[in-house]
Amino acid sequence: MILDLRLVGVAGTVWTAAWLLSGAPEWSTLSQLTLWPAAATLTGLVLPLRRARVRATLTQVALCCAGAALVAASIAVAAPARLPVEVTEAAASHALVTATLTVLSSPVETASFGGAPAGSSRVRFRGSITKLSQGGRSVAVAVPVVVFAEAPAGPALRIGTVIRLPARVRQAEPGDAAAALVFGRDPPETVADPPWWLAWADDLRARFAAASARLPGDGGDLLPGLAIGDTTAVGPALDGAMKTSSLSHLTAVSGANCAVVTAGVLLLGGYLRLRRLARLALALLTLLGFVVLVTPEPSVLRAALMATVLLLSTGSGRPGRGVPLLSLVVIVLLVFDPWLSRNYGFVLSVLATAGLLVLAGPLGRMLGRWMPARLAAVIAIPLAAQLACQPVLVLLSPTLPLYGVPANLLAGPAAPVATVVGLVACLLLPWLPGVAWGILQLAWLPSAWIAAVAGTSAALPGSRLPWFGGAVGVAATGLLTFLTLALVLAPAPAPAPARSGAAARLGRLGRLGWLGWRIPAVAVLALAFGSYAGSLIGSGLGRALAFPADWQIAACDIGQGDAVVVRDGDRYALVDVGPDPAALAACLDTLGIDRIDLLVLTHYDRDHVGGIDAVIGRVGTALVGSPENAQDRRLHERLADGGAEVRTGARGDRGTLGGLRWELLWPVRGSPVMQTGNPGSVTIGFDGRGIRSVFLGDLDEAAQDALRRASAPGRVDVVKVAHHGSRDQSQGLYADLRATVGLISVGADNGYGHPTDRLLQILAQVKTVAVRTDRQGLAVVALEPGGHGALTLWTERVASRKSD
């Protein structure tokens, strides 16, 4: 198969322009003034040319300039509309506004956000503000936003619902898909229900989820995700196993899911002997219905579009057309919405589709040498997608899934069965519930198999191997993947007939030429494998040698949340427990901690208390904030039942941890304000053994300024940055602290834009070294032996550094 790659360069140029200009829209006008004339000039030069090669090259460059100019024009038009002056003024003044908006994604439970009542049930979803009201004045707008709000007391919000929400708004980071963040102050009020077709799909999804819940074990929890992309029943343990084994893509509605559905319809059409055009039309209509059923979120719409590319490529009878068609789709989407260029989901959708178009066929033929052709094709599809996406996946998690490919080979063939059979059961539930229940039990079998593969793979030793992060990790993974595929898929030379003399010598030279580039490729792979294996073998010894034996502070890498340990000898304090018990338990095991002398829970958001199960029964004293509801009080009871002394803390409380002194700096006891939620975060400072530290919880800017006025901490060596590095920070407080190290406990690709550029600039201005758990992993601070106050900073993924 010959691939047509002529539009790939244009798509790459358009993507680069979109990525750059979406983060700096103020340059879009100047870019147009440069690119449009360049495109016109090149077009004028091309027309009279007769040399085909030069003509083709200049045409490519002209198309690249025109594509980039279209992106610049799109941003110049869209940027002011995305962020009108009414929104920027409301954000700057922190004014309370009333937003009328349409829900565009399924709400998910969120861990925390500034300004909302603590302890309440909160959700996050994408939406579009259609009207903004303030002070009796209303203005029509069209602003893409991410909304953080209390969950309504009645039915859950659904896609397509129009709501009214009293809220405050903040500008998002430049380049984000959302132009602003909306923080609701009260539960949303429903203004209009979704259209009938969205309501029908929501009812069908609810029926399917309820029926699947009756099935046993992880198979029942996983089935809605495999069939219709509903992962609400997937618990943390199963979710972690799916991610560790590189199977989480099976529960996200992707181009592969859409392709499975359309492929089933095409097969049915072939069985009914329909014409090709009729089969394609039927498949496209089915795809449209599937999109409605699984919720028409932006990511699902993109997946459906990628599946359409595969469908049209296959249906045309010329698979080689798929690459230019994919390139054209990328160009159109990025011109229509340049902010997609920074979306990881879009990147992975494009790469997975490209992998299926380019790699699935050759891999299937290669595997077909040792197994039946149909089985080879089934295995080649997930393998091609995994190989194409892996270089980008290391940006999200700088690890290599050792068993990812075998797990996909084992689970991959079961996924389309679970999808198709589960989807049939879902569609039959309203009309033939008995028949649907029987089919649902059949769908449970492949679902349970996938869950078992995920659990087994995740439990094996070395299931996630450390790898390079950032651009180095992408480049290294891409190079090694390319060399491996080139060696495996390159055709071997045909055996030459027996010859003598000069002909024989020429034949040997030809075979040597075939080996020419393969010898260095094998050498590079062997060197890389040997070096990496050696680093893994030596990592335990290297870690033991580099890890500061007398460390005092350790920030655990537990995702989007806080869990920081303070130590003196064999005495340990833990400030917050993060969102996930398994992640916290792994960190405590790494640090060799089995007992917590002092536990501080700054407030009750899930990203600070969700991991509590990891320490129940291991805590001596717990300092907590004021409880707001029965759920908070039950948490106190669980700690007490586990043997902990639970005390509500406030400013002025003091104590010791071995040779360290600690003091609570916030909140003020008895104050009518800032007692709960982020503004009421219990703030603790430690002093002793040469290091002063302060832990700011999720304090917002107003609370930080109030802390300065009430009990200024003074200069410290280490500060745990507030609220994972959000924008809502007091520059004055960090200037007062003048910390040497700023610990930012934050999750990779967290969706909030944490840590923000504003926070990083604040730290840079006071020469505080920013240490991020999302990029550097576990971070440990110690006092340099004999260093006269110098600190040693050790991080899991960055070499040790010393700070004066």
Protein language model annotation of sequence segments:
Residues 1-87, 183, 302:
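N-terminal leader/targeting segments
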Residues 2-3, 54-249, 586, 595, ...:
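Membrane-interface helix/helix-cap signal primarily in integral membrane proteins
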Residues 235-404, 469-545, 626, 643, ...:
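Hydrophobic alpha-helical transmembrane segments in multi-pass membrane proteins
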Residues 2, 152-166, 192-196, 235-239, ...:
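Non-globular, low-confidence helical/coil segments that flank catalytic cores
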Residues 355-462, 740-745:
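Alpha-helical transmembrane segments of multi-pass integral membrane proteins
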Residues 2-19, 170-171, 175-302, 311, ...:
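Aromatic-rich juxtamembrane segments at the membrane interface
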Residues 23-27, 72-92, 299, 340-341, ...:
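C-terminal region of N-terminal signal peptides and the immediate post-cleavage residues
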